[in-house]
Amino acid sequence: MPEGPEIRRAADNLEAAIKGKPLTDVWFAFPQLKTYQSQLIGQHVTHVETRGKALLTHFSNDLTLYSHNQLYGVWRVVDTGEESQTTRVLRVKLQTADKTILLYSASDIEMLTPEQLTMHPFLQRVGPDVLDPNLTPEVVKERLLSPRFRNRQFAGLLLDQAFLAGLGNYLRVEILWQVGLTGNHKAKDLNAAQLDALAHALLDIPRFSYATRGQVDENKHHGALFRFKVFHRDGELCERCGGIIEKTTLSSRPFYWCPGCQH
């Protein structure tokens, strides 16, 4: 599943394609959304926001399209009039004079009014977004030590969108490798230096992944600077200590780590 950096890059691409341009055609696959097609003709996208792995497309008439790609959803940008070559099922089409954005295969799609947006169950439940520039390590540290999260093992906590939105499995293992911790630790057991390092890594690594334009594709992460230290590198040498990277399962997800330098 794409994680926060990949969702944010998708949002950037959508904004670059159609932001501020009048919509000339709108199509939704789901019957409950059909009524909005005519309401959106002539309107424009004001901005595309991410909340963790959810994407919010805001329109000039104050409606917002909520979509969560889950495992299979994908947005694509094409020139208007061009057919996208895919076997995926089209769910959403937003067309302007020169560019069209298409959402395929997703099933979690809703149109929300401003009032509904504030009350949406997922958006109410989700924690601060790791890519939000206003989120600081100090706030992250407060969340780590809060009664709600301080007794949770990191193996599960770092996958919980209620803790911090946008984290996922590759970020989980890379963050824990960076700070030299295993997944069975809890925030309440860390010393001050460990807490400080973890709070910074929880923001620095997702933001570094996003900023260096890496792409997750077929279990590889291709980017100018960001590269995996442990994710999908089981059996290889750890660049920090020379130990052998291992793979296990934690919180029902593959977990990659180095026994030599993660304790």
UniProtKB/Swiss-Prot annotation:
Keywords: DNA damage, DNA repair, DNA-binding, Glycosidase, Hydrolase, Lyase, Metal-binding, Multifunctional enzyme, Zinc, Zinc-finger. GO terms for biological process: base-excision repair. Its cofactor is Zn(2+). The keyword Cell cycle does not apply. The keyword DNA damage applies. Transmembrane segments: none annotated. Its EC number is 3.2.2.-, 4.2.99.18. A zinc finger (FPG-type) spans 229-263. It catalyses: 2'-deoxyribonucleotide-(2'-deoxyribose 5'-phosphate)-2'-deoxyribonucleotide-DNA = a 3'-end 2'-deoxyribonucleotide-(2,3-dehydro-2,3-deoxyribose 5'-phosphate)-DNA + a 5'-end 5'-phospho-2'-deoxyribonucleoside-DNA + H(+). This is Endonuclease 8. It comes from Shigella dysenteriae serotype 1 (strain Sd197).
